[in-house]
Structures are given as structure tokens and as C-alpha cells.
Amino acid sequence: MGLFSFLGFGNINAGIEEFKRSKNAYLIDVRTPMEYKEEHIPGSKNLPLDNMKGISSIVKDKNANIFVYCLSGGRSAEAKHRLNQLGYENVKNIGGIASYKGILEGRRYHAS
């Protein structure tokens, strides 16, 4: 068991696969808008950690499957906690984009 797994941070690659298989699922990037614009996982929505109360503008169903990620897993752990407090029960912290092995979108990947 790795350090991040021990701390409750999920495996982002396995988490993305689970997200793709899930119905009524949302992938939420809790990093800042600037970080999100630089790079993000396709299909994700940006909802910064300091705006968790804005989740209702993205996810109306409190029983939906919500997968949260950040850079390394720390902010997404806090986001999971805050979303649980707001009544969203099916929230998974899938860890950090730094460990993601898939395709990313964002400014970093466009020719200038």
C-alpha cells in the first residue's frame, strides 16, 4: 500500500475507469481555474475547492456518483469531506492528476 493510498487518496487511473463505467457520474477537478485551464482530464468540470457550495450548479442529484481529483490528492480529500457535509454521499477522492496516465486537455497541449 502506497503512502497516498494509506492517506485515503485513490488511484486516479483506476478512478477514471470507474467513472467511465458509472451511471449518473460526475468528474470534478477541484484545482484553481488557472490550473484547470493549463491541463485537465477530458470530461471533467472545474469546481475549485473554495467554491464547493457551488456543486448544486453542476450536480443536482445528491445521490449521483461524484469523482473528485486535484494535483496530488490533498485538496480532493478536503473536497470529499465538504461535499459529504453538503449531503452528497457518493463522493470518491480519486487522487491527483500528477499520477494520471491518460490523455489530458488544456493550454499546455495546444500549439501556440
Residue ranges and their predicted role:
Residues 2-18, 22-25, 33-64, 71-112:
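Rhodanese-like catalytic fold shared by cysteine-dependent sulfurtransferases
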Residues 29:
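N-terminal glycine-rich beta->alpha transition that marks the start or flank
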